[in-house]
Amino acid sequence: DLITNSYTRGKPRHVTSWRNLKTRDVCDSLVEGRCIHNGCQCDRSAPHGNCCDTDGCTSLWWCPKTKWD
């Protein structure tokens, strides 16, 4: 029960945090199609999967380097 309750309690916080980060995702053509997610710069041609699509960043972003702006 303790494990289940802890997992259930932690889940809403994780979802809320993800949505907050998601709103700051941007797929910027000005940086060669790179996707910037919460200070993390992502390449569309990354081997780990696409970073950008028409809706912005996907959950499969890969970060070769960080960018703080």
Swiss-Prot record:
Expression across tissues is: Expressed by the venom duct.
UniProt keyword list: Disulfide bond, Neurotoxin, Secreted, Toxin
What GO molecular functions are on record for this protein?
toxin activity
Q: Please outline how this chain is modified post-translation.
A: Contains 4 disulfide bonds.
Keyword Secreted annotated: yes
Per the record, the domain comment is: The cysteine framework is XII (C-C-C-C-CC-C-C).
Q: What is this protein called?
A: Conotoxin Cal12.1p4
Organism lineage:
Eukaryota, Metazoa, Spiralia, Lophotrochozoa, Mollusca
